[in-house]
Amino acid sequence: MKKKQQILDYISDFSCTNASGCNYIALGVKPCGGPREYLVFPNSVNQSILQNLVTDYNEMDHQHNLQTGAVSDCMLVTPPNNIDCVNGVCTIID
């Protein structure tokens, strides 16, 4: 989806310096509820702009699910436990 790429491009314009400079946000909506994934981002982004972009994307995703009768695995996607700043990029550490 173009909207998701817009979000990723927006985030890529910012960097972090350490793990405490990173955060996450739920992105996408599974057909049976809950987020599709979590997106990590540096705290240096304008969080109201990011929230608006993500809210729009999540609503589009939800509407797409309804219109297409989409199904999913319904597995719970949990927030990341470990986020680090790797070479200026917020990264989920497994």
Annotate each PLM feature.
Residues 65-94:
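Short flanking/linker segments adjacent to small metal-binding domains or redox-active Cys/His motifs
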Residues 20-59:
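Mature extracytoplasmic domains of secretory-pathway proteins
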Residues 6, 34, 67-69:
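Generic preference for well-ordered secondary structure
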Residues 1-20:
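Acidic/polar, low-complexity intrinsically disordered N-terminal segments immediately downstream
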Residues 49-75:
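Short cationic/low-complexity microdomains
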